[in-house]
A protein has these predicted regions:
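Residue-level signature of the cytosolic catalytic core of signaling kinases
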Residues: 1, 24, 52, 56, ...
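A feature for the membrane-embedded catalytic helix bundles of lipid/isoprenoid biosynthetic enzymes
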Residues: 31, 63-182
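N-terminal membrane topogenic signal
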Residues: 1-9
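Hydrophobic residues in alpha-helical membrane-spanning segments
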Residues: 4, 15-17, 63
């Protein structure tokens, strides 16, 4: 299915994005990252518009986002433009999401029909994280917008923490619901 293919393309694009970033080819990195971002928007839209939603797609899309963003953030930290504290907040949120998802979907009560549906705060957070990468790439291209870094970091940290808390509550509720059904 096309939406799943777009998610796989996004995962594959991560490799040249990281390589271009490490080689300080910021314009190429920016163009590749924009292409990956477009594929992210398209896969969800196509899946919903043409009723192509699937359990695989509900897992593959956020995995593609995590691979792209995590590799980008680690590389941006490595080259010295992303602070460690923000990388750690993002990492903790991702651990909460992955641990909760594994716990829920490996549970006895989950079914093949379960679809992972991201919350609004999670969608906003993903957009803000993508915007952060784009912003940092523009700074590396000397666009002259670096005076807003601290504010951008705080906005992304806040949305990431709120999204992590939202997922934490979601997984606790789902776990309690599973336990009460036993």
């Amino acid at each position: 299915m096309l939406p799943n293919a777009l998610s796989i393309i996004r995962i594959i694009l991560t490799v040249p994005i990281v390589i271009a970033l490490l080689k300080e080819q910021y314009l190429l990195t920016l163009m590749l990252f924009l292409l990956a971002g477009i594929s992210d928007a398209l896969d969800g839209w196509i899946a919903k518009q043409f009723s192509l939603q699937s359990r695989l797609g509900s897992i593959l899309d956020p995995v593609a986002d995590k691979v792209l963003l995590t590799c980008s953030f680690i590389t941006l930290y490595w080259i010295g433009v992303l602070p460690l504290w923000l990388l750690m907040i993002i990492f903790v949120r991702d651990v909460i999401i992955i641990a909760g998802a594994l716990g829920y979907f490996l549970g006895e009560e989950s079914s093949e029909s379960d679809l992972l549906e991201p919350s609004l705060i999670s969608k906003v957070n993903t957009v803000l994280q993508i915007a952060l990468v784009l912003y940092l790439l523009l700074i590396k291209l000397y666009i002259g917008i670096d005076g807003f870094q601290d504010m951008v970091f705080i906005i992304v940290a806040t949305s990431t923490a709120l999204s992590g808390a939202d997922y934490g509550l979601l997984w606790v509720k789902k776990f309690i619901l599973q336990e009460t059904k036993k």
